[in-house]
């Protein structure tokens, strides 16, 4: 085959890979953000939502936010927000584009190293379509996975370019790309090890193996190790910073909580569990709770690993791709296998995004070899490969759909796992946000059965109870949360809300102040304290609290609204109007802001504008008595008595015996020129 025809075949393969991958992941364009880290990465991160700014860039490079230093990932999320705002579907599609790019780069690198187009294409297709990779692609918070892998693949391509014709410029290009990858996610710490494996096969740079493309540039092991030292030098500070950031964020699990023995057992078992899910990808979940394994299970898993490793070493000279693929799989999982435990998961699908490439290489090269040994026709290999890819595509299509929103995601997780505290918690939070308080209560109760000493669970259950109007039960749960964790600022804040709802303003004020002593940057506590101060007539203090909330969280619509209320009560109508408008720009469906803006405009004799705001409030909430009353007043002042009467009557239907509405309606009836109406 000519070089030109090979090039066109490669183009055709790339087009097919891109189209099929895009088709499988196309549904994500309608998906939502989840409450599983997407809030920290995007929806509640003001630095990211501000787009690419100098201040944001400085923050990204100087702050180990959310337990990891990954400035390029933050910049990528910032750029998304600048281009698409909070359009979740667009953020998802960017992840898909990176996944497609990674797929094409993997094909390109393997094809260049091996000149085996179809086998390289098969590896790339498995990478693109395997269900275990859905988590890395369909989850916005895993931008770090697809972005760091993009630089991983570029580094490998640049390294192959360097090996073909070694010079300083090509080497520095590979080194620079590796450094960029580390700034997206420190998963690249194992890349020098993988480059050594590639030196063995398929590059054939050692005296123990032949090059896959027949070009042998033999180097000593010492030379190859020295060649990787600059890469290793990058990994050392990256590893230290990552460990420090995770420890600083409380993510590192200490040895007294999780002994070394349990970690080793989980690591050995997880290697085999990942293998099982690679070849039988069912029951996949966004979170796998930590489990204890018996010695029998651990020994069985160890025997599997030892058996495969022994077979690979035995066949290493005849089938070097087995050696490279297997050690790729084992080695790239080391940072995330749980020996240094970060978080409470026992394993995670996303951790396989890079490691599975090693297994795919083993399958892609071993399958044809086995069929040749068994004298099977070539079409058997083609049919087997096609069946595998179709199966992966179908399973991935189903798995993708679980990531549509919080409810679909965590209901699926609960269906395929047991005693999953995180799934109960996040599903409960999602139901709480939807106002499904009874269902949320059930989820938080289930969470407490699993983790009875969880202060956050008691706090969340209390929120659900408060939403059902069960104030006494909610207060008891907030108190339980604070007995377990007295410095839980959110529980103090929420307890303040419950007490304020009972009219216990002094006690509520004390709880808000307690929350702010613990967490001075809790904008919601500043805002809630302001509401209580307004109710106590302490307007100057309320204004100060609203302003404090807005310094922390400029897009907190409720703080703008309450600041408007405080200013209006001080007679600063123009300033109040500005705050109401600011609140409505952020949250256009805030009926209180529409109504109060209308009242402020009416006080400036801007009656037409005021009536427009009352009407806007009633379009959103037709049973809003205050807006009906204010609209009635405005209509009466315009002499539109019949319409005003209708609004007053509607007000009294919603709030019987409300004095202002009774007085307004009585005045109309008493002063009407129609005698029958007066009587």
Where are these regions (language model features)?
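Short coil/turn linking the two alpha-helices of tandem helical-hairpin repeats
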Residues: 398, 469, 503, 537, ...
